[in-house]
Amino acid sequence: MSDFIDRALITVKAGDGGDGMATFRREKYVPRGGPDGGDGGRGGSVYLEVSPHLNTLLPFRFETHFEADKGLNAGRQRKRGRTGEDTFIRVPPGTIVSAEIEGEVQTVDLLFPGQKLLVARGGKGGLGNTHFATASNQVPRIAELGQPGEERELQLELKVIADVGLVGFPNAGKSTLLSMVSAARPKIANYPFTTLSPNLGVAEFNDFTFVVADIPGLIEGASRGVGLGHDFLRHIERTRILVHVLDAAGTEGRDPFEDFLTINAELKAYSSELAQRPQLVALNKTDIPDAEAFDELMRPQIIAWGIDPENIFPISAATNQGLQPLQRRIVDILREMPERITRLPYSEEILTFRFSNIDPNDFWLETEEDGVLRVHGEKIERLVSMTNFAQSESLERLQRVLEAMGVSAALFAAGVRHGDPVRIEKAELLWQDESIG
């Protein structure tokens, strides 16, 4: 099986919008042709898309930056630029996406194959000069730049989705059990912590398929993070049945029943809901002579603790002994459950992050560390990012909007005077004569 990676940090950049054009009709029989500059195309957006064929975030170890196509610039004769193509990034089911949106960290859980999450919106195309013609200005020499596409950092975290989670102390035989009931081939060796990340396998019994996750070995203190406990325990959260694998022969020199109590205490400390999940007990390594004595001693204790006698199975994962009754019981329990992980419904749902309902005309001022005032606000930031400062009419338009919105008055009231710098978006402007030019 390929390396299992369950955390990744990536950056995504949507495409910038294409620039609008400031051109005029130049035709023989049209003496007053007027403006004919087209609009720029919208930039492509970036989506995460759930793929049922992935079960790890390994691809993001090698590629961490993703961009969508830019919108094309406009043409003459009102020709609109082509829209940039969207980018789709495939992620496995069970991926949790976290991002900072408007100063708040938001998380979205992607579970269903086909489900999409819009993570970066493409920029709008800039308007051509046809939009700026007025009765008093019939030859506008002004066009907008394309709006920059959104860019953000995403934290990806995978919690495996499986029907059955194999839990137990290191070296209890979980990986061997997984390899015997499925086609998975996890690393197996006779020392603790051979498994450092979950292994997944698809098992089939009596024409019923189910997904099994071999969870790395837990130890005392796992619920507090000891021995990578938090990294391991979170992968159990989305399993529906727990199979507790015990070294019934005590080959590691520990008391198997004490191991049983310790693991269950850690499960309860991590999540009370997790501790209530259906649990089967597999008394493993029964092919070793000492196991029979431990079995006779442990079975009454495990039953007294609360495990149904029907849910206790002596097995030998190494020799395939006793595995069929265990699998039969797993299938019986899963058949009674309303949902099967292996049959997650396909979804065409497109999810988005939550954005505030702040009035786009609102703005506020912030003094930065060097004492320069910065203007924040959706509309004003978008306008500045789409202003072509090489066009005098664009500067005049910006000045009119600043004054109409009350930004100029607010800056003057805040103490800005002639020649002082003011920052809006990525631009640094100079205050001139009680206005910004």
Curated annotation (Swiss-Prot):
**Chain positions recorded as GTP binding sites:** 168-175, 193-197, 214-217, 284-287, 316-318
- InterPro entries, per database record: G_OBG (IPR031167), GTP-bd (IPR006073), GTP-bd_Obg/CgtA (IPR014100), GTP-bd_prot_GTP1/OBG_C_sf (IPR036346), GTP1-OBG_CS (IPR006074), GTP1_OBG_dom (IPR006169), GTP1_OBG_dom_sf (IPR036726), OBG_GTPase (IPR045086)
Which GO cellular component terms, listed alphabetically, does the Swiss-Prot or TrEMBL entry include?
cytoplasm
Q: What GO molecular function annotation could you give as one example from this UniProt entry?
A: GTP binding
EC assignment: the record states 3.6.5.-
* SUPFAM superfamilies xrefs: Obg GTP-binding protein C-terminal domain, Obg GTP-binding protein N-terminal domain, P-loop containing nucleoside triphosphate hydrolases
Keyword annotations for this protein, in alphabetical order, are: Cytoplasm, GTP-binding, Hydrolase, Magnesium, Metal-binding, Nucleotide-binding
Compartments (UniProt record): Cytoplasm
One GO biological process term:
ribosome biogenesis
Gene3D superfamilies linked: GTP-binding protein OBG, C-terminal domain, GTP1/OBG domain, P-loop containing nucleotide triphosphate hydrolases
Residues annotated as domain OBG-type G: 162-335
Q: Where does Mg(2+) bind?
A: S175, T195
Which cofactor is recorded for it?
Answer: Mg(2+)
Q: Name one Pfam family in it.
A: GTP1_OBG
Q: Which domain of life is it from?
A: Bacteria
The task this protein performs is described as:
An essential GTPase which binds GTP, GDP and possibly (p)ppGpp with moderate affinity, with high nucleotide exchange rates and a fairly low GTP hydrolysis rate. Plays a role in control of the cell cycle, stress response, ribosome biogenesis and in those bacteria that undergo differentiation, in morphogenesis control.
Name by which UniProt lists this protein: GTPase Obg
Species, as recorded: Herpetosiphon aurantiacus (strain ATCC 23779 / DSM 785 / 114-95)
